[in-house]
Amino acid sequence: MIIPVRCFTCGRPLGHLYPIFKRRVLAGERPGEVLDSLGVYRYCCRRTLLSHVEWIDDVLAYERRS
């Protein structure tokens, strides 16, 4: 839902890489090559970035209002 700040497994900071990763993948680059060029080689960190889904806008539609 919210961009992961750190890898869930090893704790490496990843939050600063996600906007770059997303922009380049949407521009048509292959995700694996983008991660390699960003220096993300551990499979746990790659998983964290590759599997992230932005659902925050969908979840906010169900926000309770007092």
Swiss-Prot record:
Binds 1 zinc ion. Its EC number is 2.7.7.6. InterPro entries: RNA_pol_su_RPB10, RNA_pol_suN_Zn-BS, RPABC5/Rpb10. The keyword tRNA processing does not apply. Gene3D superfamilies: Homeodomain-like. The keyword Chloroplast does not apply. Its cofactor is Zn(2+). Keywords: Cytoplasm, DNA-directed RNA polymerase, Metal-binding, Nucleotidyltransferase, Transcription, Transferase, Zinc. One of its GO terms (molecular function) is DNA-directed RNA polymerase activity. Zn(2+) binds at C7, C10, C44, C45. One of its GO terms (cellular component) is DNA-directed RNA polymerase complex. It catalyses: RNA(n) + a ribonucleoside 5'-triphosphate = RNA(n+1) + diphosphate. Part of the RNA polymerase complex. Belongs to the archaeal Rpo10/eukaryotic RPB10 RNA polymerase subunit family. This is DNA-directed RNA polymerase subunit Rpo10. It comes from Pyrobaculum neutrophilum (strain DSM 2338 / JCM 9278 / NBRC 100436 / V24Sta) (Thermoproteus neutrophilus). The gene is rpo10.
